[in-house]
Every structure is written in C-alpha cells, then in structure tokens.
Amino acid sequence: MHILLNTLYLMTPRTLVRLDHETVKIEVEGELKMQIPLHHLGSIVCFGDVTLTTPLIMRCAEDKRLIVFHDQHGRFKARVEGPVSGNVFLRHAQHEALSDSKKTTAIARNIVAGKIRNTRQVVLRGAREADNEDDRKALQETARELAHGLDALSRSPDLEQIRGIEGNAARHYFATLDRMVRVNREAFKITHRNRRPPLDRMNALLSYIYALLLNDCLSAAEGVGLDPQIGYLHVLRSGRPALALDLMEEFRAILADRLALTLVNRRQIDERDFVERPGGAVHINDNARKEIAIAYQKRKQEEVLHPVLNRKVPLGLVPHIQARLLARVLRGDAEEYLPFMYR
C-alpha cells in the first residue's frame, strides 16, 4: 500500500478498508497495517482482492472522493463517485486543451523527451553489457543519436516536428535493438518495428507486451477520469486510445523492451514458443503468452525511484501517477507535465 499525490493505492490481497470516525483503517487478514486521517486522502485506488466497507464508500461519495477498482492484473473495472463529479470539468479541460497549441505542444514534447531519455538509458545499459566491441560501438552510436534527438527536441516549435523527432529516434533504436540480444540472436533478429501482423519473433514478442502495457495505460487514464481517446502526441482517430498511447511512450523501452530482452537472454522464451502463419505472420503460442504475462506482472512489482515524488514506488503504479500528474496540468493545478525519467 502506498500514498502518492493524496491517493491511497491498495495492492495487497485480502485487504479490508474501513472508516472509524474520521480515520481510514487498513487491515490485512485481520491485522491492522495502517491508519490514515480521511482528510489526507483525495482518492482510493484498489487492485485485486481489496474490500471497502459500505460506510467508507458512502462517505467518500458524499465528500467527492474518487474510488477506483482494478483487477489483480491492473485492468480498470469501475469507479465510484458521488452524484456530482469533477470528471466532467477535467474532461472538458482535456478537450479544450486540443485548441491550445502551446499547451498540447508542451505536453507532447515532454512525453517524447521522457521516451527518448528512457530509451537511451536502455541502450546505454545494453552497451555496458555488450559481449563484443562491435555491439558496444553500435549501441554507443545509437545513444549519441538519441542524445541529438533530445537536443533537437528542445528547439522544436511545433507538433509535427516533435513527431518527426520521435519517429527518427525510434528508427535508430530499433535498427540496433538486436545488438542487445546476447543469445539466439539469429532467431530474434529485428531491424525495424512491424506489426499488424508482426513478421518476426521479436516483433511478435514486443507487440504482445505492448498490448499489456497499453491496457495498463488505458486503466490509468480511466481511473483518473480522463478520456483515453483524447491525446496530444498521437493523432486522433475514431476508436483509437490516443491518450493511453501517449502515456505508454515513456514506458515502452524500460518496461516492455527490457522485459522482452530479459526473457530472450535468459532463455525463458525461445523460437519454439512462436508459430509462423501462412503469409508470414508470427504469433506466440498460448503457453508462452501465460509465461510472458506472469513475467510482466512481476516486472511491475519492481520498485523504481520516481523523480517527481522523490521516493520509490512499484513500476506498475507509475502510469497511474503520470495520469494524475497530467490531470493536474489540464486542470491548471500544475504548469508543466513532468515525464517519468528512469534512473
């Protein structure tokens, strides 16, 4: 359990949360674990087997404190709100921001800055762990290109230029991604990103993990009360969760790509876990999907330092924190969206 940005996050199975006068009491299997004055909380977010008593739910609804329920995998299930919700004002601000090019450009620029910086951290780590000088030099060159992208980003005045810088950084990155594959490289060779359908094993693996990550970012946006389809970096299209795609950019390399590389390099996944369909599409078999999903959930439990909060939090909570930071900017409670910077 964590309290971040006036939000109580409950993740421990068999947790009971009840209201005792003006104090929220948290018990796990009958043992009192934490007591929090109710006025310290703005919202409560539950994951998995967490029970809130009716008096607490009713009081939160009365006070306009948001309660959000996710399943144990982080999928959004429900929100409990009082009769008059502040979400309508948040969503109005979210839509209004589309006509404010200065605000949307600033948000998009910082999202891309977070993505490129985090990607560069992964590349630099790959260079340090490289088995040979050729791989090390190639990855160091990619890191330099990503640094140039960050420098260009600070001078980019409009959204199209920002998107162009992001796309160029992604091309450099994927051109050398397989340099970080240390075992069975030929079976997991990748030179560029392809999807719908993926045409090689690494792209199939990345697509599956990206789908898991997108689901988490959808849940983060919905849990805060944002419209997942109204984003600022990705182009708006009918049925496309543009905001969730925006949120996930900061986490692609550090969560999804690092996990894919770890699974391959530790031989937890190999070529036998994939099936090639007629036409060249490559799919992951069901057993491997289960193993990958389990590994993904474990990765989300690892703690990382959040630079804005200056404290360690589970990696799986960071998309939820970022969604709340973005909501603060849209409401006017903060001037700038600060992306998550991985260390």
From Swiss-Prot:
It holds the Pfam family Cas_Cas1. The keyword Hydrolase applies. Keywords: Antiviral defense, DNA-binding, Endonuclease, Hydrolase, Magnesium, Manganese, Metal-binding, Nuclease. One of its GO terms (biological process) is maintenance of CRISPR repeat elements. Its cofactor is Mg(2+); Mn(2+). It is an enzyme of class 3 (hydrolase). Its EC number is 3.1.-.-. One of its GO terms (molecular function) is DNA binding. CDD domains: Cas1_I-C. Mn(2+) binds at residues 166, 234, 249. Homodimer, forms a heterotetramer with a Cas2 homodimer. Belongs to the CRISPR-associated endonuclease Cas1 family. CRISPR (clustered regularly interspaced short palindromic repeat), is an adaptive immune system that provides protection against mobile genetic elements (viruses, transposable elements and conjugative plasmids). CRISPR clusters contain spacers, sequences complementary to antecedent mobile elements, and target invading nucleic acids. CRISPR clusters are transcribed and processed into CRISPR RNA (crRNA). Acts as a dsDNA endonuclease. Involved in the integration of spacer DNA into the CRISPR cassette. PANTHER family: CRISPR-ASSOCIATED ENDONUCLEASE CAS1 1. This is CRISPR-associated endonuclease Cas1 1. The gene is cas1-1.
